[in-house]
């Protein structure tokens, strides 16, 4: 196994592990109607997201999202092997997609629990997998705009 493939595999595994552990803790310790205030701008909540990012497209059902996520993940794996220089960017996005696929396969929805807000303006709840995907996309766009 090449060093980049090894680092990619370890990165994906660690991100997936952190994602699944934090979701397990959210299930175990957060109630669906409760809020845990951590900081003036950060709460922990429990949300069962049957849609996509920000809860959109709930009507399409979990099976649709699993298929789309698997296709996207397959494409990203293909891109990784074409462009191993960006291994960490692909690791973030692949791990995030897999983390949410695992939720949909096990529960039929994605578990979100991070609630960022500014006073009463709340960003939709999200999770570690969503964060990994978002950071990966931002890095991908930044790197490609720099060219």
Curated annotation (Swiss-Prot):
The keyword Transit peptide does not apply. Its EC number is 3.4.23.36. It is found in: Cell inner membrane. Pathway: Protein modification; lipoprotein biosynthesis (signal peptide cleavage). The active site is at 112, 130. GO terms for cellular component: plasma membrane. The chain crosses the membrane at residues 10-30, 34-54, 59-79, 87-107, 121-141. PROSITE patterns: SPASE_II (PS00855). It catalyses: Release of signal peptides from bacterial membrane prolipoproteins. Hydrolyzes -Xaa-Yaa-Zaa-|-(S,diacylglyceryl)Cys-, in which Xaa is hydrophobic (preferably Leu), and Yaa (Ala or Ser) and Zaa (Gly or Ala) have small, neutral side chains. GO terms for biological process: proteolysis. It is a multi-pass membrane protein. GO terms for molecular function: aspartic-type endopeptidase activity; endopeptidase activity. InterPro entries: Peptidase_A8 (IPR001872). Its main location: membrane. Keywords: Aspartyl protease, Cell inner membrane, Cell membrane, Hydrolase, Membrane, Protease, Transmembrane, Transmembrane helix. Pfam families: Peptidase_A8. The keyword Transcription does not apply. This protein specifically catalyzes the removal of signal peptides from prolipoproteins. PANTHER family: LIPOPROTEIN SIGNAL PEPTIDASE (PTHR33695:SF1). HAMAP family: LspA (MF_00161). Belongs to the peptidase A8 family. This is Lipoprotein signal peptidase. It comes from Thermodesulfovibrio yellowstonii (strain ATCC 51303 / DSM 11347 / YP87). The gene is lspA.
């Amino acid at each position: 196994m090449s060093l980049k493939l090894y680092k990619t595999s370890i990165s994906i595994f660690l991100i997936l592990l952190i994602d699944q552990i934090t979701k397990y803790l959210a299930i175990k310790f957060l109630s669906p109607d409760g809020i845990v205030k951590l900081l003036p701008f950060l709460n922990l909540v429990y949300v069962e997201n049957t849609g996509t990012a920000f809860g959109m497209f709930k009507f399409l059902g979990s099976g649709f999202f699993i298929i789309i996520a698997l296709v996207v993940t397959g494409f990203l794996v293909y891109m990784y092997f074409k462009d191993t220089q960006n291994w960490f960017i692909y690791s973030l996005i692949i791990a995030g997609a897999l983390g949410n696929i695992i939720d949909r396969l096990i529960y039929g929805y994605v578990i979100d629990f991070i609630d960022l807000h500014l006073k009463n303006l709340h960003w939709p709840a999200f999770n570690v997998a969503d964060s990994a995907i978002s950071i990966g996309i931002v890095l991908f766009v930044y790197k490609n705009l720099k060219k």
